Amino acid sequence: MALTFTSYKNQTNDVLQRGIVNTVARTSDLLAEIPVEKVDSLLYRYNTTDYNQTLSFVDAGEGFENTDVEAQAVILELKHMGTYADVPLQMVRGGNVADLRANVTEVKTENFAKNLEEKIFYADGTSKGFKGFDQFIKDGIGTKVEKAISYDALCEVVDAVPNASAIYMNRKTLRAVEKAIKTEGYTFGNVTTEGGKLVKAFNEVAIFPTETIKDNEIFVLEYSTSGCGLLVCGDLINTTDMGLLENQPIYRTMIEGSYAPIVRQKGAIAKLEVPMLRTAKK
């Protein structure tokens, strides 16, 4: 089983960290499901491939045909992000310190998860060099389909990712898609995720609604060692209870991590861009 935020929450013995990891996984379906790969450096170099090599049978004693696989070298730079969960001392007087800090930390962690998810999808590489899935597609690593919503359009974008693991869209788009395919005589099915969550599915690919995705876009991702993932330098998420600061009347918890999305081959990601959320005419 691949390392994810969902699986990691059961692997750490740190109570604070376990709670924060659990909040991240609960807040973001993307972070709950995406496979995480730990690396030892903030720079990571790899090659993306354009196609899989085709092999043929040969007679005994014959040599094998050597077919070159086109590849593109990519260098990713992991970027550091974090936040402080601060509780001023004056808020604590007469209250429960632990409860107040827990509440603030949960809110800050939810914000951390939402911001990280948004960057994983849409960071354009200009801000600190962090490149999201949308930019990978713009750079030619992935497939873009521009069509009105229809059953065939959904099939096309899902088929562009042969081993698709997940579909992401916001709730407005999901309602439009569900309405459109229903008029064509189709409905969504249901599947259970590795985390035990029952979700809608299209062609047995899990659908995760998230308000991070723009109104007119649908992303399809493959989660595997040769597909999409998230690089992490160090721990999946680092948490430090700094206690009451010496120079400020503040109780502080620090939440941080170093990340970079990765797409290892073109067939691992696709996006359906729907003009003005129109549905296809029958």
Language model features by range: what are they?
Residues 2-51, 70-81, 95-98, 131-155, ...:
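Sequence/fold signature of self-assembling virion shell proteins
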Residues 56-57, 91-98, 103:
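Extended, non-catalytic structural segments that build the interaction scaffolds
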Residues 60-64, 215-218:
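Glycine-centered loop/turn motifs
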Residues 81-90:
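Residues forming anionic-ligand binding surfaces in small-molecule and nucleic-acid pockets
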Residues 102, 106, 110, 151-155:
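Solvent-exposed, polar/charged alpha-helical surfaces in well-ordered, non-transmembrane soluble domains
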Residues 109-117:
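Sec-exported extracytoplasmic/periplasmic mature domains
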Residues 117-132:
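Short, glycine/acidic-rich hinge or "gate" loops at secondary-structure transitions
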Residues 167-170:
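Conserved hydrophobic ligand-interaction patch in extracellular adhesion modules
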